[in-house]
A protein has these predicted regions:
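Long, contiguous binding/interaction regions
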Residues: 1-238
Length: 238
């Protein structure tokens, strides 16, 4: 359906659709080929990442349930781990342990931090070796609903200010300390993940968002809220 490469992120998103067995086979072959062509030890980019195939979500489009899609995700993850020897983590609907189901939580530490993280008993992969592959890294495979990736540029080059706005709006919010106690302060938008980052090719900072349920938070609501939060911090959306 689409191939979307990004220069600053050094990342390409490939979207394809088809019958279940064909999609699973295509995904497996794509993961295999990415591992052959991409050397993660030399990779740099503005987007969080942990492997040559960073994440592989399966999405039920028609004639298949989320539960069935999750079962296929597990089958694909098992095959990747066994046949390719890549550490694989399940996420979203395919992950039974909800403490490990969030992509950003799994990917925390990124490629550079996973050599240590994978040794933690709490972060053993679901499939494949508990050894981080220097060239191919690891991958995350799961089943989820449709997601809208939406970026908003700001009239600033400050990643710090962009992150502050991202934390204002994202559902996870930020951790703050009150009376010596660390508490979570939720953001204003449900079903939204967001980070701030500087995009060299544009020369500006931006809010990079994933809208995980556009029935809960549609694009126009996310845009308006980012505008409000940016304005409150003396920043404009461009």
């Amino acid at each position: 359906l689409n191939v979307d490469p990004g220069k600053a992120t050094n990342r390409t998103v490939v979207t394809f659709v088809g019958h279940t067995e064909a999609v699973i086979e295509a995904a497996f072959l794509a993961i295999k080929k990415a591992g052959e062509l991409i050397d993660m030890s030399k990779h740099k980019g503005e987007h969080p990442r942990m492997g040559a195939t960073d994440v592989c979500p399966l999405i039920p489009v028609s004639g298949i349930s989320m539960e069935e899609t999750a079962e296929w995700a597990v089958k694909l993850a098992s095959r990747v781990g066994k046949e390719l020897g890549i550490p694989v983590y399940l996420y979203e609907a395919a992950q039974p342990d909800k403490k490990r189901s969030n992509l950003s939580v799994i990917r925390a530490g990124e490629y550079e931090g996973f050599f240590k993280k994978i040794k933690d008993p709490l972060w053993q992969p679901d499939f494949g070796p508990a050894e981080f592959d220097e060239k191919r890294g690891g991958t995350v495979i799961g089943a989820r609903d449709f997601l809208v990736a939406y970026n908003i540029n700001l009239n600033t080059t400050s990643t710090r200010r962009a992150n502050a706005i991202a934390f204002d709006v994202r559902e996870a919010g930020r951790n703050v300390v009150e009376n010596g106690i660390k508490i979570n302060q939720p953001g204003s938008l449900k079903s939204v993940k967001a980070i701030g980052r500087y995009i060299d090719e544009y020369g500006v900072a931006q809010i990079s968002m994933n809208l995980t349920n556009i029935q809960v938070t549609p694009v126009h609501i996310a845009f308006d809220e980012v505008c409000r939060k940016a304005d409150a911090r003396g920043v404009r959306v461009t």
